[in-house]
Amino acid sequence: MDADRLAELQLTRAEMRRIGEALQDRRFRELLTEYVEEISSPENRRRYEEEIRRLEEERGAAVQFIHPTPHHVLKGRGPSGKCFINICSDQLIEKPRSEAATDDRGRSGHSWRIPYSLTPGRAGRDAAGAPCVLFDAVFHPDALLMAENNARFMTLIHRTATGGIQDNFRIRLEHVTRLKMMKYKGEPQPTMIRRPNPGQTEAADRGPQQTTGPQQPTGPQQPTDPQQPTDTQQPTDPQQTTGPQQTTGPQQTTGPHQPTDPQQTTGPQQPTDPQQPTGPHQPTDPQQTTDPPPTAPQYRLKYRSVLDLQDYRCCRDSGSAGRPTAIIIEVEVPRLRSAQEAELRVEERRLLLEAPTAEYRLELPLAYPVEEERAEAQFNHTHRLLTVTLPVLKRRRVEEEERRAEEEESRKGGDEDGELHPDCGPDPPMMELQTEDTHTPAADTHTPAADTHTPAADTHTPAAETGAGLGSGVALLSSSNVISVCGADVHQQLEEPGDPSAHTDPADTHPADTDPADTDPAHTDPADTDPADTDPAHTDPAHTDPEMESRIAGLHLQNTLCFQLD
């Protein structure tokens, strides 16, 4: 252990050699021994404390030295390693006091006020020689006496000591336990408590400002200050010398000049505030001290998931294993006394924690939507840790998504089926096609009035009439691409000859009856129309060309097959 302490000094070879040579000198050893006895002597320590006390009193502060009496030790773990808290007592600490009070539930009890003193952490070593940190918490002896007889009061003493160290030194202590076989860790050291002196102020006792106060010769001329000397005092205001001079006035001229001091302070301050730049800066200082901005506490974010083998199936309805079931947030709030001092708001995508008394504010966005109604919060008084558990909303079921997708597909499909061909109407059934294309004898029968006894007009080919009839039937079935193609084939087959004379029956054509004059509609005389001259071959339904009937039957069969295949 001594070798480790020597290594911490980081001495060079030259320094080690010089120390070795000095220790060989007898005179050096005598001086070193005398110095050790001097600093360890109680009388010298008392003299040293008295000198420090006088020096602080001259500066306007009352100093008290506390010599802690060991009682027991608490052991914990901090951010840098082991920590030991020495619970001590001293008569200079105030006694604990209690007052009758009621809690939020209306239960009556006592509210305790326990004064204590803390020392900053100092380096030390544990039993194994590892580095550690030592703290001292000093209470009044009556407080420790009550704690020995009451376990709840002892717990209150421990919480007060650990909470004060965490709040004042900004560290976190974990796993704090009591060591029963140890009263003090390390070497007891006196503690100095410095309080302001009631008779003086610290601002008036500063070095360069103490000399300016007594040197002013304006003491007896103070009643005339509000009229003339205000002009001479204004240039001294930017030098920040009027602040301590005004405070030293009532301290030095206590008796007769007290009624004139308020006039001096209120007189020059009111006209100089709007003129000099020192005025607007004065109200900003108390705002900065009274309203400090809240700090964001440290937190840890965790995601909790429940392992389920159903989530790993090769199915579309299996859940996603990467989505957590809950979000856990651990917030460190060492300055928070109880959970009632904090306000927690949970939204679907945001968490907000506000503690005005402890000056905490934390706004945290959430990666997953959570259920606000099922949120839980738990506060650990020992570790000053706030744990918030937020259940994550489950993902939408796959069945609902599939149903919605099917509805959208069916809606789109209905829109596409509703679009009709510009040349076609709605799709008729197959029976309507057969009845439409079936040529009755009455449809092909030419009335005598329409024949007008002209041989040229009698040359109406059955193919042209049949093509017109089939064209209308095909147009009714052109609701799809296949039927439209079939309809185009029908028209192409009907229009292939291109020469109307090719379908003219030689038996129906009379060359002798052909007259160029008769072919002109303008020269047609109604009187020339004779019912007896009507060709009986045109009015006979049985008089039909066999070749055209076979072609019409083939076209009917082709249209029927195209409709059934579609």
Curated annotation (Swiss-Prot):
GO biological process: axonemal dynein complex assembly; cilium-dependent cell motility; epithelial cilium movement involved in extracellular fluid movement
Low complexity: compositionally biased ranges: 208-290, 440-467
Cell compartments where the protein resides: Cytoplasm; Dynein axonemal particle
UniProtKB keywords: Cytoplasm
One Gene Ontology term, aspect cellular component: dynein axonemal particle
Region (Disordered): 183-298, 399-467, 493-552
Biased composition (Basic and acidic residues): 399-424, 535-550
Cited function: Required for cytoplasmic pre-assembly of axonemal dyneins, thereby playing a central role in motility in cilia and flagella. Involved in pre-assembly of dynein arm complexes in the cytoplasm before intraflagellar transport loads them for the ciliary compartment.
HAMAP family linked to this entry: Kintoun
Family according to the record: Belongs to the PIH1 family. Kintoun subfamily.
The protein's name: Protein kintoun
Native source organism of the sequence: Danio rerio
Gene this protein is translated from: dnaaf2
